[in-house]
Amino acid sequence: MAAKDVKFGNDARVKMLRGVNVLADAVKVTLGPKGRNVVLDKSFGAPTITKDGVSVAREIELEDKFENMGAQMVKEVASKANDAAGDGTTTATVLAQAIITEGLKAVAAGMNPMDLKRGIDKAVTAAVEELKALSVPCSDSKAIAQVGTISANSDETVGKLIAEAMDKVGKEGVITVEDGTGLEDELDVVEGMQFDRGYLSPYFINKPETGAVELESPFILLADKKISNIREMLPVLEAVAKAGKPLVIIAEDVEGEALATLVVNTMRGIVKVAAVKAPGFGDRRKAMLQDIATLTGGTVISEEIGMELEKATLEDLGQAKRVVINKDTTTIIDGVGEEAAIQGRVGQIRKQIEEATSDYDREKLQERVAKLAGGVAVIKVGAATEVEMKEKKARVDDALHATRAAVEEGVVAGGGVALVRVAAKLAGLTAQNEDQNVGIKVALRAMEAPLRQIVSNAGEEPSVVTNNVKAGEGNYGYNAATEEYGNMIDFGILDPTKVTRSALQYAASVAGLMITTECMVTDLPKGDAPDLXAAGMGG
């Protein structure tokens, strides 16, 4: 086993604080409308330029093992805030640094670390309740656009795009961010349900100019099996031909004689048909077929429940206003399924989302909800260079998470004002003993840190601005972008409550652990390990 280097008490804490400061100082230059960029070197290709706190934090590794432990613990704060709310990583880092710095000063002055931690925890719990009381719902698209703008580092076009996307696909809809091809940002909205499976034969194409199959008011046959024998399908095909409508077949696969017969029928104009493979694999395919059945008012023909394809009637088929199929995707527009059944199915999937353990499963389930409930919007980010594209895409992603968080838990005044107001309200808070009271003061003083940092990055004097903001009331604050005071809500400077809450909770959690650290252990570098004495001769 490798030899260890052990540090105790103040020696350990000083090293740890140095690591915290290196990481936090690198991250906090990005805070606020006048935050600066950080350039990250890559082992290959162009360097990355970013204003995203968590991206900066993830890049930092320090040579000194003890300092590195401090830095890694604060990195955890940024990552956790990012996972919970998708934004607020820089705010969380600034808060953590402030609580740790003040807390370690108190420990050095002889306070009991455990009591300090209890005081900090009490202040944070009370602050979270106050934040909830200050929070106002974020429902109209103007507020959504403002939240998106602030989170994308004051880029108004991004805020407007996200608000427009949410308008189109609803609050539950899926919004994805992709690389664009031009210089301008674009928004593509896919209404209805779309899945990644195209036509099984190009002979089904009836719109050669677009290379797509477009069928108006078709019947939709859903089968959880491979179809290779045309005899199984004859009754359904005859019924559909009599009804004079087109038919879309969504099955595990359609092959051989069955596919050939469908192609011949289509080319001769006897019955318009298009066949596609069902989306997904295994159990997920069964679930997605059931989703399509709910949306179109049809039934999945599955041998598992004793249904046979030969016995299927028009009653078992789903219907939609229009189906568009191209090489890679199928879109079902305006299925005739009952609203109550669709909502029931959405509720069922939401329950599964709550119980899902892996992020991948949760993401797939959320996609299914979106496809049933609204639609899918794609924001295509435009930029002049690859480097700018990456930076902008990261900002749009942040803004998207922030707006989702705002819709979920509401918004508070931005620019660090909400935390200053909360700290003022809790000024009279006391605990069981003097050391715990100091812990409360440490947390309340730290709540001013984000405002101070925003002002500092804007090149103003933090103490003067902080005192002016404290002298005001309600949403009165400082707009660092225009360097004026006023109502933050009127300025359109809003922060999602969830982002502010998560930043404070995670910062306090890790800071509390670091304040109560008394010993640090790390491996000695190989060269520093004590040499073993040469073995003597046996006597």
Swiss-Prot record:
Q: What class of enzyme is it?
A: isomerase
Q: Which Pfam families does this one have?
A: Cpn60_TCP1
Reaction(s) catalysed by this chain's protein: ATP + H2O + a folded polypeptide = ADP + phosphate + an unfolded polypeptide
Give the source's domain of life in one word: Bacteria
Q: Which organism is it from?
A: Enterobacter asburiae
State its location(s).
Cytoplasm
Indicate what this protein is called per its UniProt record: Chaperonin GroEL
Keywords assigned by UniProt, alphabetized? ATP-binding, Chaperone, Cytoplasm, Isomerase, Nucleotide-binding
Q: What is its EC number?
A: 5.6.1.7
InterPro entries xrefs: Chaperonin_Cpn60_CS (IPR018370), Cpn60/GroEL (IPR001844), Cpn60/GroEL/TCP-1 (IPR002423), GroEL-like_apical_dom_sf (IPR027409), GROEL-like_equatorial_sf (IPR027413), TCP-1-like_intermed_sf (IPR027410)
Question: Does the keyword RNA-binding belong to this entry?
Answer: no
Disulfide pairs here are none
Described purpose of this protein according to its UniProt entry: Together with its co-chaperonin GroES, plays an essential role in assisting protein folding. The GroEL-GroES system forms a nano-cage that allows encapsulation of the non-native substrate proteins and provides a physical environment optimized to promote and accelerate protein folding.
Annotated GO molecular function terms are:
ATP binding; ATP-dependent protein folding chaperone; isomerase activity
Q: Which GO terms describe its cellular component?
A: cytoplasm
Similarity section: Belongs to the chaperonin (HSP60) family.
Q: Which SUPFAM superfamilies match?
A: GroEL apical domain-like (SSF52029), GroEL equatorial domain-like (SSF48592), GroEL-intermediate domain like (SSF54849)
> Which Gene Ontology biological process is one annotated for this entry?
protein refolding
Known partners and oligomeric status: Forms a cylinder of 14 subunits composed of two heptameric rings stacked back-to-back. Interacts with the co-chaperonin GroES.
For binding ATP, which residues are annotated in this chain's numbering? 30-33, 51, 87-91, 415, 479-481, 495
